[in-house]
Amino acid sequence: MQLKIFLFKLLFLIFFSFSFNNFAFGFFFNNRYDSNFFIDKKYTKDFIFFKKNECFSFLKYKKNFFLNKKIIIGNNHFIGFFQKNRFKIFYIVKSKDTMYSIAKNSGYNYHELSKFNSIKKPYKIIIGQKIWMGDFLIDKNNNDCSILNLEKNSIKQHNSCEVVFKNLLNIEKFLKDNIKTKKICFFCIKKIKKNNNSLKLKFFNFSNNWSWPVKNKNTKYFYIDKLGNKRIEIIGFKGQPVFSTAAGEVVFVTNLFKKYGLLIIIKHDQNYLSIYAFNNSVLVKEKDRVYKNQQIATMGLSSDTNLARLYFEIRYLGESINPLSILPKINTNI
């Protein structure tokens, strides 16, 4: 009788162990290849900010039976997970988001962003999906991260992130006492200054390699700077030739965005992109190499005015810049 009981218990333990391992393995396997899972990359890249700074609330100090403890932070745009000495930052996909729109707003090439997140053509994403945007390093040598105190009567309004996150005991104590009354803020003032200096240098060295995308004796155009989108809209006639302003590779051709009609994006040397919209027809395809002044499209009608014009934009390192600072000088505008 005792032998039977022993064998029964042994079989039960074997069955339980097998079931647990399958469940744990299935949990890991399913989540490892889901872009919503916390991705542990072999490489890292710096987080590019939407604004000059990003502040996050502490959402949880999460304990999971299968995973290690996680510090989770979040705001309206991003969610972050703490690992070792850095926060891995993810964008939360919202309604009407596309990989292109996310990449454009965050300063990335959408091919690069898709590659980082193992998202392949046709680049389908779903609401709530997490797109890895980069890492923010907690570094004692940089004063670019602070813990802000939300309590009005507090004597000390902020603390260094490095002090709080330098060891696990500090983190546990801090979050146990302060998770609802503190925010963590990342600052990128130094990075912005550095980028501005490099922009001026690149403009100076690169300006002679560009030409206007429309060839008119008297070119008429509007310069528009709206919500950080710097562009010119060149007036012409429907079917008028549109030319590549510099040599490069066609990286995007689409008609998915009704506001822009047929859209072309060309990647140039030194991290520049040129964008052509409101096209009536397109004469190139993705991955085509184009040369300066090669015809790539014909002019169409803008979506809002129904008048013939070309939407033209230049981006450097994903940031919209004034095309007039690069294109050869002309005398005529509106």
Curated annotation (Swiss-Prot):
Q: Which GO terms describe its molecular function?
A: metalloendopeptidase activity
Lineage top rank: taxon: Bacteria
GO CC terms for this protein? cell division site; cell outer membrane
Give one Pfam family, short name only: LysM
Matching SUPFAM superfamilies, A to Z? Duplicated hybrid motif
- Name the PROSITE patterns for this protein: LYSM (PS51782)
Residue intervals of the LysM domain: 89-133
Name the protein family: Belongs to the E.coli NlpD/Haemophilus LppB family.
Output this protein's name. Answer: Protein NlpD/LppB homolog
